[in-house]
Swiss-Prot record:
GO molecular function term, any single one: structural molecule activity
Lineage of producing organism: Viruses, Riboviria, Orthornavirae, Negarnaviricota, Polyploviricotina
GO CC entries: helical viral capsid; host cell; host cell nucleus; ribonucleoprotein complex; viral nucleocapsid
Name of the featured protein: Nucleoprotein
UniProt organism field: Influenza A virus (strain A/Swine/Cambridge/1/1935 H1N1)
Main location: virion
Amino acid sequence: MATQGTKRSYEQMETDGERQNATEIRASVGKMISGIGRFYIQMCTELKLSDYEGRLIQNSLTIERMVLSAFDERRNKYLEEHPSAGKDPKKTGGPIYRRVDGKWMRELILYDKEEIRRIWRHANNGDDATAGLTHMMIWHSNLNDATYQRTRALVRTGMDPRMCSLMQGSTLPRRSGAAGAAVKGVGTMVMELIRMIKRGINDRNFWRGENGRRTRIAYERMCNILKGKFQTAAQRAMVDQVRESRNPGNAEVEDLIFLARSALILRGSVAHKSCLPACVYGPAVASGYDFEREGYSLVGIDPFRLLQNSQVYSLIRPNENPAHKSQLVWMACHSAAFEDLRVSSFIRGTKVVPRGKLSTRGVQIASNENMETMESSTLELRSRYWAIRTKSGGNTNQQRASAGQISIQPTFSVQRNLPFDRSTIMAAFTGNTEGRTSDMRTEIIRLMESARPEDVSFQGRGVFELSDEKAASPIVPSFDMSNEGSYFFGDNAEEYDN
């Protein structure tokens, strides 16, 4: 975690960089992207995929997953020490889809992890290129965020399913480093901490001995990451209390749930990055585009530009709507699962609808699904405008919000009111201000009550024409605030299952 005074931008976290200037950052992010692209090209050659098959998002996901699994040291070690029936710890693979005689066929492939690591390193000038691996993890995480609701996980940790807007990055592995920590929502950090505390309550030895010491360090580090996301002194002080606790237990769980609730109004700073599938980077590199020389940013115009000029295909099940599948992937590409739908619609230039109204299931195809009836179609991932991604939660104010999701987490730095349903949120805060954190709780509640409806967030920030790469002329959109803005509104999205 960067200490005070050495705040690094996401791009620096993304590329493990020390302090760099803007040009160096753009170059190192570009280098990371071209490494992913070169790796993807090589894998398509190895697998003898046609151009169309190489641009199929399902094939991209399998290839990305293979390299992530090949580099998952802890799991590899675990698999070697606990051999399970029918699983070769040295191999990795998945489904590859090919077009044969006018039909889609599924082929299960298996590769040596060592071989995949060799191809990856070769594509990345001999480096392990951890930044590129993390980038792919964040893309998978963003896809999960747009596809699934985490209701069950929220309920299991004692949180409210309506707090889903705080759950960005909830499926990111712990090993995703600083870049991963930056994109995790407040709810995600709270959930990780609660799980840890609950294990400590049930297992007497959890905090003891050499292992316990390591656990404690991890606990405090996670608290520090959470603290860094809060923007008010009272919230930060309360995280300090949780971190300093001698023997974390139910009181800390209560405090953490309180903090998570407060983040619905007093929003945390959560980074947003546009991470695209490898099948976008591959063809761009193959066409001769030099990412490292041109430079690249995950939070500017570059991903929008890249998507304007990319062809990506997806398998479509018999009763799915290709336009809806496109929306799902568009949201994932821009990490916009918890953004206000009005803002997303304006930028995309087509209406973005709530999850429950989408006629599409996830992008991945289960191994038992019938391939006979599978079609494929082009994903429409282009946009009308572009906007800078945000790393702050914006300031807070009150608007009508929905029954399913009662707050949003902004993705795009665009002037607007940030909707939340104050009465619903505040109802959860009645009477519970006793105990050692009482003064902080009182202060946080006061701050929440005084959050004003008229406050406009991201003052003067707008969207930009795709021809305006220097972001010179912002267009500040006006939004109809009487409409519904939440994606998971009164929703029936599938649950995420590990």
